[in-house]
Amino acid sequence: MEITKLTAIELSKKIKQKELSVEEAVKATFSAIKKREPYYHSYITVNEEEALEQASKIQIAIEAGKFADSPLAGVPIAIKDNICVKGMRTTCASKILEDFIPPYNASVIERLKDAGAIILGKTNMDEFAMGSTTETSYFGATKNPWNIECIPGGSSGGSAAAVAAEEAFIALGTDTGGSIRQPSAFCGVTGIKPTYGTVSRYGLVAYASSLDQIGPIARSVSDCAATLQVISGADDKDSTCVKAASYDYVSALRSDVRGLRIGIPRGYFSEGLDAEVKKHVLEAAAFFKEQGAIVEEFDLEAVDYATPAYYVIASAEASSNLSRYDGVKYGYRTADFDGLQELYKKTRSEGFGEEVKRRMMIGSFVLSSGYYDAYYNKALKVRALIKQSFDRAFERFDIILGPTTPAAARKLGQSLFNPVKMFLGDIYTVSVNLAGLPAISLPCGLSEESSSDKSAGMPIGLQLIGKPFGEKDIIRAAYTLEQTKIYQRPKLID
């Protein structure tokens, strides 16, 4: 039995049935990390000594009858490096936080620990979650386990790569404009971006506070649903966190879409979408129709303006959130300065990477007095129109189906020379964040064509978008599709 190939739910069940121990699961995972990390670079920090100590404690607790109802008891989990874990370095993949060690746990970490999960370490990401390739990390780029010449996506690229490379059973990521769904699509795994307010953001280092949301990445819909069930729920430490009627997402794991109304936005399948992606996504639509779902095309208005609106709003919020990193209280401080102004200037200039500086400059510009109405206010109006457009769509449909990305993963280095191309890679995902909706990305095929900037045999993902707090519908549809497919896995380097 290859332990690292099990799903998280299978692993936890075998631990409870005494077919293997928590320590064996943790050791098997760290063995995979040691073999593969030189090639993939999924992690920034690993936590082997403490993970093994936790494994021993969790094993004793399980044998004493605790965690009987937890689907994650004994499961090794990776955490994106912008989520605070007490006593563990949390860098946001930035020089400016290179040595920052939080004195507290994020709420999601407390909930994972309460469920008996084991924290493996912190995964690589785009600096401060600004990027969609995981190439802007101060600690170096992460490689896609399907092909190390290709990007894993971003900004949660380390989390997606770790799961795909069997270096973690589950990983937490964050999604501000597609940063869970896009790398999940590129790495051939499953990722859920929950409804805004479903999961507490307490302990998440902020990028754009009205858009950020924490969610799970795993190798199955079941593992994603189980993890989301554990980390969801109201939290007094996050005023934007909503108390929902139910967080029982595991009950949605049934193969039945009869009568489910699925909308296909025509605009998602127009110019700019790779032909192979279009083919596989439409095949999934045909499958749902065969299974008894009601599938119809429709026009989703205003989403063509989602990308520019998103980058105006997200950059504006980032310029405010990142103003706290000035070398005074914590984080990197320049060694040589003359006066407070020079301390600020040199610390920020030396501590932030180019992409972060670019977005902070955009944010400061659109918030300036001469351009506030021309850019920021207009972007907020577009955001409202997009939300209204989705509201009208969900009067007719239960879920919306489309591609996660315009194409499969490109080769490393392509986006760094063309930031606009990187921004446009989020064209199908950012509108979901602007509207605060839930969405899941799951694999639906592999690419066949290769060229100078892309390779054959790379995963293609589709996206299912739900109504606010409609996670159960998208999980049910995703699970139904998953049950009919034999998913290929990458040929990993050992």
Curated annotation (Swiss-Prot):
Q: Which reaction does it catalyse?
A: L-glutamyl-tRNA(Gln) + L-glutamine + ATP + H2O = L-glutaminyl-tRNA(Gln) + L-glutamate + ADP + phosphate + H(+)
Q: Which PROSITE patterns match?
A: AMIDASES
UniProt-listed InterPro entries: Amidase, Amidase_CS, Amidase_dom, AS_sf, GatA
Query: Which residues are annotated as active site?
Result: 80 (charge relay system), 155 (charge relay system), 179 (acyl-ester intermediate)
Its BP terms in the Gene Ontology are: translation
The alphabetical list of record keywords is: ATP-binding, Ligase, Nucleotide-binding, Protein biosynthesis
Question: Which GO CC annotations does the UniProt entry carry?
Answer: glutamyl-tRNA(Gln) amidotransferase complex
**Keyword Lyase attributed:** no
Short name of any one Pfam family annotated for the protein: Amidase
Q: Does the keyword Transmembrane helix apply?
A: no
Q: What is its EC number?
A: 6.3.5.7
Query: Which GO molecular function annotation, any one, does this entry have?
Result: ATP binding
Summary of the function given for this chain in its UniProt record: Allows the formation of correctly charged Gln-tRNA(Gln) through the transamidation of misacylated Glu-tRNA(Gln) in organisms which lack glutaminyl-tRNA synthetase. The reaction takes place in the presence of glutamine and ATP through an activated gamma-phospho-Glu-tRNA(Gln).
The record's listing under NCBIfam families reads:
gatA
UniProt similarity note = Belongs to the amidase family. GatA subfamily.
Self-association or partners: how does it assemble?
Heterotrimer of A, B and C subunits.
What protein is this chain from? Glutamyl-tRNA(Gln) amidotransferase subunit A
Task: Write down the species.
Answer: Lachnoclostridium phytofermentans (strain ATCC 700394 / DSM 18823 / ISDg) (Clostridium phytofermentans)
Protein's gene: gatA
